[in-house]
Amino acid sequence: NGRPALDLAILDSTDPAQVRSAARRAPMAKTLYIVASKSGSTSETQAHLAYFWNRTVRGLGKTKAGNHFVAITDSGSIVEKQARERRFRDVILADPNVGGRYSALIAFGMLPAALLGLDLKLWLERAAGLMKVSLPSVPAARNPGLVLGAILGEAALAGRDKLTLLTDEELTAFGAWQEQLVAESSGKNGKGIVPVDVETQLPPRNSPRDRLFVYMRLTGSLDAQVKKLQAAGHPALVLPVGDVYDLSAEIYRWEVATAIACAVLGVNAFNQPDVQDNKKRTQQKIAA
């Protein structure tokens, strides 16, 4: 708390032009590279590590390069082995029982939050507050994660399986995280909820009848639009967000809700058969 925020850039593309652009914007002598991978074997992460490690070794020398890298990974992974062999500045071992898309409130999300200058104590307190009212002992009607999840699941079964997330401008980035969480958890066995993020809004009367709208409300800039959707007969939920620290509670709410929605749909929220298949195919292509 009180520490100055650092510039944080997230590289999630293997496009050579974007990788080179990211490298040019970050002078290696002043850059800390965070290598984040639960399994450690993800091809894209390994490609990024190889590129930036070799580049840093060439620029700073092998003895200094390791001080510019930190790894977040599961115990026993390839990345842990590489990090220790190369003498990374630190190796942070995450909880192996938490799946990748559910890991925003463990080390994978907490380290970037710390670098951005967030008060981690307050961040976790907000999440813990939501967790307390999401326990199985809390009556269903007062359990925010269960209520949202039940609505998502039942709406999907009723044909409203497209989930449109509406946010005020300050919360736009939340949609990218929520999109992966919902899609990767629910989309399997011919079932699923399709999240729609950053969508050009149609007039309420022209919006498809297969939609469920959820508005993450911080400033109220979309109040009028949401009222029009509701007046046109579209289900539109409003989730109030007080400030940036409330996002940790929303992360927890959406994780619980996604698991509940998947249970309603009859799919396993925590496996990822298509993801594993895609990883296998990618590795086969690279090896060919």
Describe the residue ranges of each PLM region.
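Short beta->alpha connector loops at strand-helix junctions that form conserved
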Residues: 11, 37-38, 92-97, 239-242
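Short, structured coil segments at secondary-structure junctions
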Residues: 4, 86-87, 232
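Structured mid-domain segments that build the active-site/substrate or prosthetic-cofactor binding neighborhood
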Residues: 190-202, 211-248
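A short, gly/pro- and small-residue-rich
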Residues: 48-60, 225-236
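Short glycine-rich anion-binding loops that position phosphate/pyrophosphate groups of nucleotides
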Residues: 38-42, 75, 218-219
